[in-house]
Regions:
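Exported/periplasmic ABC-transporter solute-binding proteins
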Residues: 24-58, 62-72, 79-82, 86-92, ...
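Short, intrinsically disordered low-complexity segments
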Residues: 3-5, 19, 83
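Bacterial N-terminal signal peptides
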Residues: 9-20
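Bacterial N-terminal signal peptides that target proteins for export
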Residues: 1-11
Length: 250
């Protein structure tokens, strides 16, 4: 059910569209790598609806935060967690009151090999693989969730020598896709449209909630395109795209 906040956002989008292309502007958006494909779709729909252009950059949430702290001119931040947007707000990098959850992420243990990954993750306790890929837990929330999952399953110490670490969840998926690792913990959004292979959607209770938050950054506080993009992200069209990629929406 669409919340009142999202209904209000939908109305704002209609008003922005009515303003026409004369008000068209551009905004720089830092996007957590797990959200690459939905962000591309949302940006295209946003341009059609408002005339504004959202220029997207993709990477790990931790890397983006470090760049922003050193003056990178991003105007909107779509993080893979809630901690960094909260920190941005506390440190004066983000506009107070603009932070909200845009998606709840899901973690998947994935392999290109059919039958390798079972429906309970028991493969992690077996000797049937040489490498498992995870994103850097210090920089990528999906990596932290992977670490928590292995610890909860009691397999982390045995699996640790087999771990290969990606700088972002995008690189982690590449490790699996190219065969550098037989299996890896990736975002559901990365494999939801991939046929074949084998996968286990990790129960949400096995790790901390992947609460993905967005925030308006100070370089964008007076940019109508930045504000419009966040309003659009809350609206029904973006919500439908987000759900299509396997995310949950509050």
């Amino acid at each position: 059910m669409i919340t009142r906040r999202r209904q209000i956002a939908g109305l704002a989008i209609v008003l922005l569209a009515a303003a026409g292309p004369a008000l068209a502007a551009e905004t720089q958006v830092a996007v957590a790598a797990n959200f690459t494909e939905p962000a591309k779709e949302i940006a295209a729909a946003f341009k059609t609806a408002t005339g504004h252009t959202a220029t997207l950059s993709f990477g790990s949430s931790g890397q983006f935060y470090a760049q922003m702290a050193h003056g990178a001119p991003y105007e909107v931040f779509l993080s893979a967690d809630a901690d960094r947007p909260k920190k941005a707000e506390q440190d004066g990098l983000g506009v107070a009151g603009s932070r909200f959850t845009y998606a709840i992420g899901r973690l998947v243990l994935y392999s290109k090999t059919p039958g390798l990954v079972d429906n309970a993750g028991a493969v992690l306790g077996k000797a049937s693989f040489n490498k498992v890929a995870i994103a850097d837990p210090a920089a990528a929330p999906y990596g932290a969730a992977a670490l928590q999952t292995m610890q909860k399953l009691g397999v982390y110490n045995a699996v640790k020598p087999k771990i290969v670490t990606g700088g972002s969840i995008a690189q982690t998926y590449q490790f699996v896709d190219t065969g550098a690792a037989e299996l890896g913990f990736v975002a559901l959004s990365q494999v939801i449209n991939v046929s074949g292979g084998s996968r286990w959607v990790v129960p949400a209770a096995d790790h901390a909630v992947i609460d993905q938050q967005a925030i308006l950054l100070y370089p964008g506080k007076d940019n109508p395109a930045a504000k419009a993009f966040l309003a659009f992200l809350k609206g029904p069209q973006a919500t439908a795209i987000i759900k299509k990629y396997g995310y949950e929406v509050k």
